[in-house]
């Protein structure tokens, strides 16, 4: 399968996941720890670029976007998502509780004491996945 990662990067990441130190990996691969460090760093950068690319693509194909306004009670967000997804005939893959957990993890900086303090965008994909985007970044793109 084609990837943004080289075979060496994949091997290093797999070994790191198994708990090996960079020094141990360097010894096994016959190179320096500094080289392994650079390989790992570039692998993580490539992964981040791939994630960003997917986010851009998902944003392009997203059939539905919701602007969550300042002053919105966080507890109302799941209902807003379900209403919008029903309009678009999209089955959201999450329960209300899961959406609340998702919002808590991915939109913390926009929320204080249950209230939205800065607007943000929720994107609903055709496959039912949801994503959080910064409103100002979204506005700048359009």
Swiss-Prot record:
InterPro entries: RNA_pol_sigma70_r4, Tfx_C, Tfx_DNA-bd_arc, Tfx_DNA-bd_euryarc, Tfx_DNA-bd_sf_arc. Pfam families: Sigma70_r4 (PF04545), TFX_C (PF14601). One of its GO terms (biological process) is DNA-templated transcription initiation. Putative transcriptional regulator. Belongs to the Tfx family. NCBIfam families: PRK03975.1-2, PRK03975.1-4, tfx. This is Putative transcriptional regulatory protein Mevan_1098. The lineage of its organism: Archaea, Methanobacteriati, Methanobacteriota, Methanomada group, Methanococci.
